[in-house]
């Protein structure tokens, strides 16, 4: 009987630690973290920014696109599809601050009741910050985000 108690004594904490590790490694959906509406139809507009440093002049080039359901329904749907499909992996230490001189994307959506979601900041290498927590974005999601930016760039420039 004593051996069973010892086994349970060690098995329960080990199971809890395993559960915590699995929860830590489980990818999180971007739309859930951003507290977006349940449906993309409830999103009124999306603000999409790309900030790129010009190292020679120490300036930044900011391209800001505000996509609305009235003007650009297809583009808005494309970004909403990305927001609902993208996954963030592995919360990382770092205080939720991005220190990188590279290109940064910022996205946030506004629902039809005019409440804005939390912004997500994404670097080109796939690091992302939401609510002060640093995550890693999957490579396929990063490639899709770059494709959306290229699509926006060809339409508006």
Question: Where do the PLM segments sit?
Answer:
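Function-determining sites in protein domains
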Residues: 2-157
């Amino acid at each position: 009987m004593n051996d069973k108690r010892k086994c349970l004594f060690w098995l329960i904490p080990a199971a809890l630690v395993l559960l915590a590790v699995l929860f830590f490694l489980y990818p999180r959906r971007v739309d859930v973290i951003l507290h977006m509406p349940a449906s993309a139809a409830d999103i009124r507009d999306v603000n999409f920014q790309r900030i790129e440093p010009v190292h020679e002049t120490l300036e930044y080039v900011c391209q800001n696109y505000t996509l609305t359901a009235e003007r650009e329904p297809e583009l808005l749907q494309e970004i909403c599809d990305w927001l609902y499909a993208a996954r963030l992996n592995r919360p990382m230490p770092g205080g939720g601050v991005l220190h990188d001189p590279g290109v940064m994307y910022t996205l946030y959506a506004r629902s039809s009741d005019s409440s804005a979601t939390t912004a997500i900041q994404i670097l080109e290498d796939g690091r992302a910050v939401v609510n002060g927590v640093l995550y890693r974005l999957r490579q396929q999601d990063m490639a899709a985000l770059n494709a959306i930016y290229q699509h926006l760039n060809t339409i508006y420039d």
